[in-house]
Amino acid sequence: IHGDINLIVEDFPYNQFDYCILTQTIQAVQKPDVLLNTLKKVSKNIIVGFNNSGRLSKSLQFLLSGSFDSLLKKSDSDQWYNTDYIHPCSIKDFKKLSTDLNFKIVSTFDVINMAQFTNGKMPSNLFCKEVLFHLKNER
């Protein structure tokens, strides 16, 4: 399926898919909260993957450089104004958004270390670079 993710999702009927998967997408869409709410009607299960902007190494980069470029860029040619990251967020930020939108967080997974984690068992917000969330629509 190909199209503008900000628009195309609205055209699908209720419960069209078993799973919807967003990888490296949620931070680049115009309105992540609206997209997630729209996906609720399309699927009861949503997998969301993103880079954790709240990890310790990113915080230290910003502290030492004083520049958002160090937080947002993927390569040396990227600057804060031309990166595809519109909404950098941390694991903690995404957990709050998920709760605010009435999603149940079924599981979270540290992609780099290939480890599942739960609240309090791993300092995920500080050390996890890439994360996957399995969300379930509670409605």
Q: Where are the language model's segments positioned?
A:
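S-adenosyl-L-methionine-dependent methyltransferase catalytic module, highlighting the catalytic core
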Residues: 30-41, 45-138
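Conserved SAM-binding strand-loop segment of SAM-dependent methyltransferases
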Residues: 1-10
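A short SAM/SAH-binding and catalytic strip from SAM-dependent methyltransferases
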Residues: 18-31
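A short acidic, Gly/Pro-enriched loop at the edge of an enzyme's catalytic core
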Residues: 10-19
